[in-house]
Amino acid sequence: MDSKYVLALIVLSSLICSGNIMAQEGIGKCRPVDLRCEHLIRPLGIDRAEPRFSWHLEDERNGAEQLSYRIMLGTDSAALVRNKGVIWQEKKNSGQMLTTYKGKALKPFTRYYWSVTVWDQNRQVSEQTISSFETGFLNTAQWKGSFISDGKDIESRETPYFRKEFILKKNVKSARAYIVAAGLYELSLNGSKVGDHFLDPAFTDYGKRLLYVTYDVTQLLHEGENAVGVILGNGWYNHQPVAEWNFHKAPWRNRPSFCLNIHVQYTDGTADIITSDHSFKVAAGPITFNAIYVAENYDFRKEFQGWNTLTFDDSSWKQAVEVSSPCSNIVSQSMHPIRKTEFRKPVSLKKLSDTLYLYDFGQNWSGITEFRVQGLPGTKVKLHHGEQLDSRRKRLFDDNNTQFYQNVKEPLKYGVHPVDEIFATDVLWLDGKENTFSPRFNYKGFQYVEVSSDKPLELTKDNMTSYFIHTDVPVSGSFECSDSLINRLWRATNYSYLSNLVGYPTDCPHREKNGWTGDAHLAMETGLYSFDGITFYEKWMADHRDNMYGNGQLRCIIPSGGWGGDIADWTCSVTIIPWTLYEFYGDMTCLKDNYSTMKKHTDYWLSKFPDGLITDACLGDWIPYKSVANRELTASIYHYKNVDIVSRTAQLLGFKSDYEYYKSEAERIKDTINQKFLNKETGIYANGYQTELSMPLYWGIVPEDCIQKVAEQLTKRVSEDRDHLDVGIMGCKTILNALTETGNVEQAYRMVTQQDYPSWGNWLRQGGTTLFENWDYNGLAAGYSQNHIMYGEIGAWFYKALAGINIDPAQSGFKNILLKPHFVEDLDYVKASYKSPFGLIVSEWTRKQGKVEYKVVIPPGATATLYLDGKGEAKQLSSGTVSYTHLTLP
């Protein structure tokens, strides 16, 4: 729609004529807030030699900015306030709010305090703001004690429980527990679980890197006798069920083990270290089986109450076995942990018989259940989790057990798959008392739970609770509009995104749980607009480095135990992830850490396909509606993007010769793509399908003089498809953006709000609460997932197109915001916010009586370039709040 706007009023404490917001005196003072070390608030166990420090400003004045800053670091907070005891300081005349430590080598196991002071646009100094961080192990040699295990065979189904009593001789000032495990663990002190983490530590290539976790346990220890307990789970380390992804053949596979160091500081200045060794006792506990894909078996008759307290008699327990470290590279898990973040009670309960019940929680997600029950001793109960009901909607339909074991030619060591090894099914044996069960070392993807038993049970809604489990990334964005369908789609996208964050990005939380690289890079923008995910993705890029072969090849799932081929349009995650982090955060660290990996992988493809086109080794536009896009075209576009990102990264990092070489290669690949696939007369790529037209437009392949033609062909094609989607996951990433960027946002909006097949809305109309794996709802009967994130770009589009919050490629980290709100005809209002590295960006508009009011908040230190309705004359804005009212449509 070609609209002209009349500017009637531009207000909120400022007058804009020339495009500048004048600074206002006396309204507020500048103050540094949200201080972070390594993008975390007051983190423990930092092991980076040169940690990063960041902050943003709190200042209500329009035009607020930081002209300069001073950062100081020391070990005494009181002294630091007086500018004393400074170990390192940095003062710069700069508006940057991210810097890196450049002082003397930090000491291990030390709490450091750091402060930030800034000078504002009027050269007035702010108050000093102080935060802290603690270092952990700065090299593996600093670990004491030994890894310990129960010494059982890797196929043993028993879950080991470890315990030890120890004496602290003095009054405790502070204490830290450092624990690293090959497998999963639950740590307790004096009968209390340590921390609120779940499924720790995160999945890695265990032969290349182990993660340790740090806890403040000061309040859990005391002078005198204490007790420590550890339960070990198999996790991703020891896959016992045979599966088609060959994790049971992973080179790292072994019996789980752990190493524990507890550092205790006494009030008199002395210290002790409690370590794991053969003095720990071990026994098999009530968890009789645990597997990350399958579930847990729990026998309440085998419980030993108080096993992790001082009063327990462990005389029948055996001595733990000291084992060698599974890996020489042990690093800190410096990211947000997996946690329980939300719970739900059932929305319905169907009693099908006195031994069969069906719970519906009304929301599909990744998680676990807590089940409270009382039954006759020895009663066997199965909790079968799933996301789909059968055609009569009375029983749970779940084809995942077949999916999990399909194509498997070999049996388990003990001959056959045990009858209780059913996918996503916990199995319990009751002891006649009131029993409460919740798994420790497993999670599922589900909405429904079918409870079956071999003896009658009387159950109500109160017997079961569902918990949402995922990497607990902080919320960074919000979105709301007048269309309830779009609001539901935004929520469904977020549930799918979070359901697939478990220390690494997965495709789905129920069946595969695999780190498919393509799904992850396609959904990344959606994730980062709504959630602060930098620490999560930086960890996953370390997984990329660990999983790379000497020739630069990567597997299509990461981490991988060896399964998976090299797939060019998937493994481009190695360049897209670091580059997208740089765009969102303005932080080059991930690019620096991964440059050699990015370069090596790109060189692998350049050598394998010297002509510039990827002719095989690709998956293409996965699961399209009907039209199958040319895979050589789509894969070659991602090949171009790989090379282009390496070129841009080389330029940023000052590698001139690399920059020139890869820039030349990128242009050569682009030219080759256009020569083979573009008809310049018609503006059609390949067959002219939606994906084949939108991908070249979105990824910058189309020659400047052909953009209009290609855009016209795209909108024509979409019109022929009745404004419906005809794409797979690659086209899903680009179709809405390409339409919007070429002036066809109304058509994109119509596509988004369709509710018949194929569409996002159709999934919700069919009862979905997350995004699906297949456009065809009926295809779910073939085992397709109802909780996949690969079609999730729509979530980012809400922010970019409707609210208009966009990255400026020339100024990363939202230093300058490209504001392109589109006032689509069928919406009455849009409200969105995004917490950028500079602070909160707010963009909202309302339509009243045919006129639009638009309001934007630009955080201190940032600027914006505004295009009303996504086009027209650019308006330059500085920080503050700006309102446009009475924008009229002709």
Write out the residue ranges for each language-model feature.
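Extracellular/oxidizing-compartment recognition motifs
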Residues: 26-510, 518-519, 535-538, 554-560, ...
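Bacterial Sec-dependent N-terminal signal peptides
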Residues: 1-30
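Non-catalytic C-terminal accessory modules of carbohydrate-active enzymes
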Residues: 250-263, 271-306, 311, 331-342, ...
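Active-site-proximal structural scaffolding
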Residues: 48, 126, 159, 180, ...
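Active-site acid/base region of carbohydrate-active enzymes
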Residues: 184, 259, 275-284, 448, ...
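C-terminal capping/lid segments that line or modulate ligand- or cofactor-binding pockets
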Residues: 228, 298-299, 512, 530, ...
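Conserved, charged catalytic cores of large soluble enzymes
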Residues: 134-138, 197, 617, 637-652
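Active/binding-pocket-proximal capping segment
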Residues: 185, 194-196, 200-201, 544, ...
